[in-house]
Amino acid sequence: MATGTLPDAGQILNSLINSILLVDDDLAVHYANPAAQQLLAQSSRKLFGTPLPELLSYFSLNIGLMQESLAAGQGFTDNEVTLVIDGRSHILSLTAQRLPEGYILLEMAPMDNQRRLSQEQLQHAQQIAARDLVRGLAHEIKNPLGGLRGAAQLLSKALPDPALMEYTKVIIEQADRLRNLVDRLLGPQHPGMHVTESIHKVAERVVKLVSMELPDNVKLVRDYDPSLPELPHDPDQIEQVLLNIVRNALQALGPEGGEITLRTRTAFQLTLHGVRYRLAARIDVEDNGPGIPSHLQDTLFYPMVSGREGGTGLGLSIARSLIDQHSGKIEFTSWPGHTEFSVYLPIRK
């Protein structure tokens, strides 16, 4: 049984593993416990008086909604807040409470890794279900399309009037266009031919192809790890994946231009599809464009989801399917001024 003098509030706050901040209505910091100082990579003295958003490259918190809740005398909780500090992304659970003295108490706790993994697995399962549904519909569409095209060809041969044949020509062309779309919806149907070689060969082919499309105000940077081991993969399929991601980055930069970085690294002790690998390859495509809109991020790998006008929304869905066939994974982080897609491919168990 504990005896003696109880610790004061400051001692308690200083011993917590969660980050605790006291801020005013402008979110200027008036107190930060050691955990918060470590998270924000600043001393208490440097933090004092600085508005929290100025300390971060990106802060996903809906500050207006939080302030509305606090003004109404209610607490506020956001179970998934993204902070970017010195280029590193942190996903946290945040709670806010107004104190009688007028300060706002912010408590930030790292999202539990198991919970985050469960969310990723659930999201991946939903994406697979959506992809399977679209493929099933595509199969149902493809069969009558063949009959429609065949009937139009027969009709074209039977029509004596060339003017009428123009209509059958339109039917055939549009049927072919729909068939091409359906084939893309169906995606890869069979595993590719795997070879064991350096992934940098694929990366260089992608660089060569994209370099012909680069405007003068876009810089393509290569940052390869020369020690990355060879790995089994289908070069054509991985080229398709990387080419799609790099072209998406190029389109995201828009007329303002910017920089795209193609990076390779070795990842250690990584779990992919329930299997633990001692070594894996990580291929990053990073750009400094405007970022992916937040309302698209949860569904970005779903078929028919696109943030670009005129886009089909199939490229990333097919890319994930191809990476799944390699027992790998593809993920991304994005905020204004930074988007990074990372492809992981297994090397050695």
UniProtKB/Swiss-Prot annotation:
Identify residues that carry Phosphohistidine: 139
Q: According to its record, what are the GO cellular component terms?
A: cytoplasm
State the Pfam families in the record: HATPase_c, HisKA, PAS
Q: Top-down, what is the taxonomic lineage of the species of origin?
A: Bacteria, Pseudomonadati, Pseudomonadota, Gammaproteobacteria, Enterobacterales
Question: Which biological process, per GO, is one annotated for this protein?
Answer: regulation of DNA-templated transcription
Please give the chief subcellular localization of this protein.
Answer: cytoplasm
Q: Where is the Histidine kinase domain?
A: 136-349
**What's the protein name?**
Sensory histidine kinase/phosphatase NtrB
Q: Which domain of life is it from?
A: Bacteria
Concerning InterPro entries, the annotation shows: HATPase_C_sf (IPR036890), His_kinase_dom (IPR005467), HisK_dim/P_dom (IPR003661), HisK_dim/P_sf (IPR036097), PAS (IPR000014), PAS-like_dom_sf (IPR035965), PAS_fold (IPR013767), Sig_transdc_His_kin-like_C (IPR004358)
Q: How is it modified after translation?
A: Autophosphorylated.
- PANTHER family reported for this sequence: SENSOR HISTIDINE KINASE, SENSORY HISTIDINE KINASE_PHOSPHATASE NTRB
Binding locations of ATP: 329
Domain named PAS: residues: 5-78
Q: What species does this protein belong to?
A: Klebsiella oxytoca
Record-listed E.C. numbers: 2.7.13.3, 3.1.3.-
Key words, A-Z: ATP-binding, Cytoplasm, Hydrolase, Kinase, Nitrogen fixation, Nucleotide-binding, Phosphoprotein, Transferase, Two-component regulatory system
Q: Name one GO molecular function term.
A: ATP binding
The record's subcellular locations are: Cytoplasm
Q: What NCBIfam families is this protein classified in?
A: PRK11073.1
Q: Which reaction does it catalyse?
A: ATP + protein L-histidine = ADP + protein N-phospho-L-histidine
Claim: NAD is one of the keywords in the record:
no
Q: What does this protein do?
A: Member of the two-component regulatory system NtrB/NtrC, which controls expression of the nitrogen-regulated (ntr) genes in response to nitrogen limitation. Under conditions of nitrogen limitation, NtrB autophosphorylates and transfers the phosphoryl group to NtrC. In the presence of nitrogen, acts as a phosphatase that dephosphorylates and inactivates NtrC.
